[in-house]
Amino acid sequence: AEFFGGGLTIRATVDPDLQAAAAAALREGLEKFDRAGGVWRGTGKVIAADRLGEGAGWRAALAEVAVPRDIAGWHPAVVLATTGKAARIGIEGVEDDPDGHFIPAEDVSWARKRLADGKLGAKAKGAGDLVEVGDVVLVRAITNDDGSFKRWSLRQVPEVQGAFMAMDVNSGRVLAMQGGFSYQDSVFNRTTQATRQPGSSFKPFVYAAALDSGFSPATIIIDAPIEVNTPQGMWRPKNASNKFYGPAPMRTGIEQSRNLMTVRIAQEIGMDTVAIYAERFGVYDPMNPFLANALGAQETTLFKMVAAYSMFANGGERVEPTLVDRVQDRYGKTIYRHDQRVCEDCQLASLGAGFAPRIVSRRERVMDAITAYQLTSMLQGVVQRGTGRGIHLPVPFAGKTGTTNDSKDVWFIGYTSNIAAGCYIGHDQPRPMPHASGAGMCGPVFQAFMQAAVAKYGGGKFRVPPGGHFINVDRFTGSPLVDGSSGDNVVAEYFRDGEEPTFGMLVDGGFGMGSNLPLFAYGEVGSDEGDATVITGTGETKVIPGKANFGTLSSGGLY
């Protein structure tokens, strides 16, 4: 009774601008994939010919048809006639034009209609090849660069679905949540309800457990074939490239999403340890300690994954996502507030120039602050030169791609210093998505949303916790370099004070590495551009052998 009749004021966390940005970004990504498939399905709804009369006739009939009306810029319409290669349409909410509204031939050349025998017909040469009189369709206006009207365009709700979520990494406030292409088309919230394999986007939790178990980003891991005898038969995980690259630093393993390195790390530290971390971060409850789950085989939700990544971003403190910021009673008294952090200086009348209020947190620490920074640095490498290198933002950010077997599910989850966001795309009934990858499909969705988020909320450098120091390391070999070294292969790794790194130690997970294997030097992505050089702090030039070439994105996943 108090809830419904007590005059309570409930403040939601969702930012309307960012919610609109999330919906637009996800819809654009889903529609791009759907249209690339080139199959016209339409709405499947038809209005009888006797209800297509001029004036209010077709409008009344169209208003009764159940089609999505919550997609920004889209309008329900009905085909009134097909003339030549164009189709004349009546559009809900748009006044009649004396010359008529038309779908021109140029708008349908991307599509083919599925024939009665299940085969695809030829590419449409005119609108009449796709639609018939009485068909209910969805349309949107295409504009010129100056915003002027160009033409009406046929649209359809994609078969592929997805979800997107963004949250404040410090307060837990959910800033945006999009559970699918259209709520009116499907009320299923894929952010919270769809349990899917996260694939390689789970790997950071394996690496986090390793970093807390004595590993460093420069620890050398063997990338070579593995065979595991299981009750279901022999399991032979593979890299996405179907190649293996020999000894490489742990940083390379996550930047290039190496499955074999990840499995060896998980075997070395123990899957029980990995499970403890996954459960501590709320990804699973419980996690089954099987090696395949180190590659993201066990299902979870996007909601849980974004919440877990938020704890990487905030330095390792527990944060719970919420859609309710606070609740006030009828007198304006706050009776519930989600964010329990304390502002030490908010009662002061003023602060000195350059000072900000101190926010004190007493939250549980789920991860060592130095481990969180090391992992963030490695995930920055993913977007700088790894599987997510096609994503660009004007502020520092980190993230991880995920692509499962046969590209049935694709992910990208990333974060700036203040906002974490994640994208998932896949069919509700899992099936392969040809040529799909987390970077290629979810990457652009993440980028489009985060550009809007950064424009509104900004972003800065990730905070370096006290208690450590930087050492320049050759990211190809894991070898230490002198201070002042420069070059494409130089990376500054952060190590704990008093725990000097051990360089040159090989980790194989107990699997070993066979002899006479066709290994690729340093396992880098890209063309063989010849030798690379490094200028050391003493002015010496060190030659690094050319990179191996193994083609396009290595998104990792379940192989």
Segment roles from a protein language model:
Residues 3-196, 200-202, 208, 215-219, ...:
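Periplasmic/cell-envelope proteins involved in peptidoglycan metabolism and beta-lactam response
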Residues 6-14, 123-129, 157, 164, ...:
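Active-site loop and adjoining helix of the penicillin-binding protein/serine DD-peptidase-beta-lactamase fold
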Residues 14-15, 280-346, 354, 360, ...:
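Active-site-proximal helix/loop microenvironment
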Residues 35, 216-223, 287, 318-323, ...:
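Acidic/polar loop patches that form or flank catalytic/metal-binding clefts of enzymes
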